[in-house]
């Protein structure tokens, strides 16, 4: 199904295809409905909500994440909290019907291990929301894969370089599911990424490899951060531009790098940090933040006290947005990258002398 929504508050339209996941936005529309070519800064409601249904992680407790070189930003090896209740999830979904396109199910653990996983997927579809999620694959079964085929738009498997990783990918592919690989790109993994892209060495049949930039949050260390002046970063983005038998994508945290190093990627296809502009994160504890990497809870708002729309328009979220609004005023590429990550400026792949990081409002 395809649909178009008119955001009357910010004067633009967006379209979404529930089958393919295709998503497009117009520019700001003038009084005659003509596209001005100016990108709208934000929507009146998040178009994608990262719903952290998991409060604890079976996979993380085994230590296998750390063994694979992944520093869990949610500290899944250390923190144990209750999973999100079905009633809380339904409350989120019912508010989002007709306003939000997708729910990215996540949190501190594998969403497919939630005790009410099937019911959660059904609630999504009942409210015209497409559920997607990322899994370690550790607990994947043919029965879970069948549920994914029935309800999900796509499933991503985290690249843990383990037998269960490959088994989960194969299980999902055999079930006919659009399957992606999520690959955390850090100092300890970029050489492998370049090598695998050079040799097209990812499982046959996958839809895409999505590269997620390592951040120093939770168990993630600063030592594993990449720097813009590391020559391997330029080599990596050169491979991103090369044709492969699978699609290559990236999270918005990597967009400044694509702007800096890529020459053949259409700027219109890039969307920089959408936190607080087109997306947000809601944890199992019903705390809402512009981005799930706000592990210091600088911008959190409790949904026990207000609706999602109220939280979206809160002072905390506005403080987050103002960091992007005030970034890099003298740079001609400001509208494309908005200064990059407002939470961790140190991860941004930019070496421009026009770079300016707006100080956080108190």
Task: Tell where the protein language model's regions lie, with residue ranges.
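Flexible mid-to-C-terminal extensions adjoining Fe-S/redox cofactors in radical SAM and related proteins
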Residues: 1, 7-10, 20, 45, ...
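Flexible, acidic/Gly-rich N-terminal and inter-domain linker regions that tether
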Residues: 1-50, 54, 67
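A C-terminal junction/extension of Radical SAM enzymes
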Residues: 1-10, 14, 208-296, 336
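Canonical Radical SAM [4Fe-4S] cluster-binding loop centered on the CxxxCxxC motif
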Residues: 40-87
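Short, intrinsically disordered, charge-biased short linear motifs at domain edges
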Residues: 47-52, 56, 60, 256-262, ...
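The −1 position to Zn-ligating cysteines in a subset of zinc-ribbon hairpins
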Residues: 56, 64, 68-71, 272, ...
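Flexible, glycine- and charge-enriched loops at secondary-structure boundaries
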Residues: 79-86, 110, 226-230
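Radical SAM/AdoMet-radical enzyme domain recognition
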Residues: 86-216
